[in-house]
């Protein structure tokens, strides 16, 4: 009787080990991935405007270029609005809004522009629960831009 119990115990342990190995050795299923690329952008480069992976949207760096001229406007306020309007457009293609942003990084060529940037930035949100954010200094940016924004959003 004890021998039979010992054999059953060994069989159960071996079966358990193989089951656990099988469960933990399988890679998790990959989240569906959708590329978001705005049509008619002024710069043709080898990157997407954003990648939607599951409920998370990874937004590429964006500068405030006028899509009609392909240039950064002279007025700083106009550049900021173009930058944020572009972010809104990318978010909308993923079925999201600015309020879905969870992390924002802004690179700026002149940190004295921080005070001009903030009120315009804040006006693009319908809530005061702003995303985590950093505002960092940068040497120079493409097309003579003063700001470059990259972000992560999570669908609510």
Kindly label every feature range from the protein language model:
Residues 4-85, 89-102, 107-156:
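N-terminal presequence-like segments and the immediate start of the first folded domain
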């Amino acid at each position: 009787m004890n021998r039979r119990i010992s054999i059953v115990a060994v069989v159960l342990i071996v079966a358990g080990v193989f089951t656990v190995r099988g469960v933990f050795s399988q890679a998790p299923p990959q989240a569906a991935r959708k590329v978001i690329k705005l049509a008619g952008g002024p710069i043709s480069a080898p990157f997407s405007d954003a990648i939607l992976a599951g409920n998370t949207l990874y937004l590429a760096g964006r500068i405030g270029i006028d899509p009609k001229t392909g240039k950064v406007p002279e007025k700083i306020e106009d550049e900021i609005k173009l930058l944020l309007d572009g972010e809104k457009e990318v978010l909308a293609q993923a079925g999201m809004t600015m309020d879905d942003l969870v992390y924002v990084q802004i690179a700026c060529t002149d940190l004295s522009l921080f005070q001009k940037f903030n009120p315009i930035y804040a006006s693009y949100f319908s809530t005061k629960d702003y995303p985590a954010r950093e505002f960092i200094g940068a040497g120079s940016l493409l097309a003579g831009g003063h700001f470059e924004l990259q972000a992560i959003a999570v669908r609510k």
